[in-house]
Regions:
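Short aromatic-glycine-(Arg/Gly/Cys) micro-motifs in beta-strand/loop hairpins
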Residues: 1-32
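Short, mixed-charge low-complexity intrinsically disordered segments
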Residues: 39-85
Length: 85
């Protein structure tokens, strides 16, 4: 199963995760992070996230895809959409 997340890099180089309304500090607890089941769902939140990221003077915003790799029981992470701000 693949999941999609929206992240930013702040002007200070910190990575923050989208919770559906705001960007929150990156940490290992992903319970508060908004997870999308499809790229289309993530893109539907893109404009709102970009607007907030710009107001925060973020360096960039991206949609990342986390893919479960059953053969090694791990996740592969790749950036599938990136915009420099």
């Amino acid at each position: 199963m693949d999941y999609y997340y929206i992240n930013i890099t702040t002007k200070d180089g910190e990575v923050m995760n989208w919770d559906g309304d705001n960007f929150i500090e990156y940490n290992d607890n992903v319970d508060d992070v908004k997870r999308y089941n499809t790229m289309e769902q993530a893109e539907s939140a893109w404009d709102k996230a970009v607007e907030l990221a710009r107001s925060m003077q973020a360096k960039d915003i991206r949609i990342t895809k986390a893919e479960f790799l059953a053969d090694i029981v791990d996740f592969g992470i790749e950036t599938v959409k990136l915009r420099d701000l």
